[in-house]
């Protein structure tokens, strides 16, 4: 059994990565406000977790203006997709071994 990813394993970050993964390939990115609603957290908490994921290279954050309003878009990077997939496989191994 391979080890899990300590960065992704934290509950809020796991929800973020799951939400981003679920959006693929339908949407290239998720708006910060929508992601906050999906994850069920505050602006500050989401921002801190996004920073951790971005530093790990798991997500890309794009800040831009739309209709003169700031907009933050978040997308999963290829490295993030691989890390999330590996972590899901790790969790499945744990669950499968518990069912035996």
What are these regions (language model features)?
Residues 3, 21-22, 82-100:
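Amphipathic alpha-helical dimerization/coiled-coil segments
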Residues 4-42:
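N-terminal helix-turn-helix DNA-binding core of bacterial DNA-binding proteins
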Residues 9, 49, 87:
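Histidine-centered active-site/metal-ligand motif
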Residues 11-14, 56, 71:
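Structural motif
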Residues 15, 60, 75:
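Conserved beta-strand segments that form the floor/walls of ligand-binding pockets within enzyme
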Residues 33-63, 68-69:
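Canonical helix-turn-helix DNA-binding module
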Residues 66-85:
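Basic, amphipathic "hinge/linker" alpha-helix immediately C-terminal to the N-terminal HTH DNA-binding motif
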């Amino acid at each position: 059994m391979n080890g899990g990813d300590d960065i992704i394993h934290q509950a809020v970050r796991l929800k973020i990565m799951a939400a981003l993964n679920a959006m693929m390939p339908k949407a290239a990115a998720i708006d910060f406000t929508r992601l906050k609603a999906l994850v069920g957290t505050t602006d500050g908490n989401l921002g801190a977790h996004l920073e951790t994921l971005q530093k790990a290279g798991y997500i890309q954050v794009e800040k831009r203006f739309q209709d003169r309003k700031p907009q933050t878009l978040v997308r999963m990077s290829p490295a993030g997709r691989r890390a999330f997939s590996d972590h899901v496989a790790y969790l499945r191994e744990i669950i499968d071994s518990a069912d035996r």
